[in-house]
């Protein structure tokens, strides 16, 4: 049902540094998986004085690959899009090695779910400097702007490279898949607002942390938003059909998906249901969880 023009082909070699644009290099960590796709792509911005975006997992071979890629250069900023285990654990070791600071939009809210979502929360992570929307970081030949994008997590932030009109999107937008939104740290209403915020900026290229770049940005973001809206209409349809419990909805909506993924799908549907309650389309009989019953309202 998605209609999203996914891009999934990426030529790379684990641990090798690749020049992917005039100002951007990438090193991919060897941590492939169902949520990380081919692995965590670490971006190095500039030459000489550089910024590093999403250093990735704490893997010794990956750390050594980054050191080799950065030999003879000076890291001025370590930038983290959000505190998940595939993005942030190497941030402080890398910053300590380089003698610089770690910048991010705060720490994570611990998950209340027993279902492992993505690589897990990096609960030990806290930035040296908390970034705010619109903060600007400069190097000798690059300018990066922080754009706060809560939704996937409460502390998610993207980074815009002004010289190339490019966005480093973390997990906010991914070319190979849709993004996981898992309450309470994930919030669908915030996610919709953050997608629209990015769409209005008119970026030429989006570089997700996982997978290849998105180069046809406007149609891709439109499809991303339309997919989420269609999912909410499907949920309303199931509620009107009498499926008042989220697990029952998931059995129908995700009938063609591996049942082992249904627990994670339940949390995605919960995020949508919370948004529908907040926008006056659905009523909850209790707290927001998987055992509460939900009902459509006239506005739906």
What is each model feature region?
Residues 79-87, 152, 210, 272:
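Histidine-centered divalent metal-coordination motifs
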Residues 10-73, 158-170, 175:
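Conserved beta-strand hairpin/beta-sheet module of binuclear metal-dependent hydrolase folds
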Residues 23, 66, 210, 235, ...:
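Residue-level signal for inorganic ion chemistry
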Residues 3, 237-300:
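C-terminal regulatory/interaction regions
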Residues 38, 57-141, 165:
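Active-site HxH/HxHxD metal-binding segment of metal-dependent hydrolases
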Residues 50-52, 57-59, 114-128, 136-138, ...:
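Metallo-beta-lactamase
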Residues 20, 97-98, 202:
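Short, structured coil segments at secondary-structure junctions
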């Amino acid at each position: 049902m998605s209609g999203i023009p996914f891009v999934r082909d990426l030529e790379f070699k684990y641990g090798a540094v690749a020049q992917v644009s005039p100002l951007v290099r990438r090193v991919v960590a060897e941590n492939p998986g169902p949520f990380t796709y081919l692995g965590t792509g670490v971006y190095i911005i500039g030459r000489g004085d550089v910024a590093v975006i999403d250093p990735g997992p704490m893997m010794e071979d990956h750390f050594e690959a980054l050191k080799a890629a950065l030999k003879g250069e000076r890291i001025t900023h370590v930038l983290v899009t959000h505190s998940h285990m595939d993005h942030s654990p190497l941030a402080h070791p890398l910053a300590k090695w380089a003698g610089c600071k770690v910048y991010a939009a705060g720490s994570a809210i611990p998950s209340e779910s027993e279902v492992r979502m993505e690589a897990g929360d990096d609960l030990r992570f806290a930035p040296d400097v908390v970034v705010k929307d619109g903060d600007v970081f400069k190097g000798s030949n690059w300018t990066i702007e922080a754009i706060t994008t809560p939704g996937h997590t409460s502390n998610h932030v993207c980074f815009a490279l002004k010289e190339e009109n490019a966005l480093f999107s973390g997990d906010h937008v991914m070319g190979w898949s849709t993004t996981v939104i898992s309450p309470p740290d994930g919030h669908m209403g915030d996610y919709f607002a953050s997608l629209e915020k990015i769409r209005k900026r008119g970026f030429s290229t989006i570089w997700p942390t996982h997978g290849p770049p998105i180069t046809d940005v406007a149609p891709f973001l439109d499809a991303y938003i339309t997919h989420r809206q269609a999912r909410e209409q499907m949920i309303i349809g199931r509620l009107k059909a009498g499926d008042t419990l989220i697990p029952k909805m998931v059995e129908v909506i995700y009938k063609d998906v591996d049942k082992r993924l249904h627990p994670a799908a339940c949390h995605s549907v919960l995020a949508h249901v919370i948004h529908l309650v907040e926008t006056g389309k659905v009523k909850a009989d209790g707290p927001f969880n998987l055992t509460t019953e939900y009902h459509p309202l006239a506005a739906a």
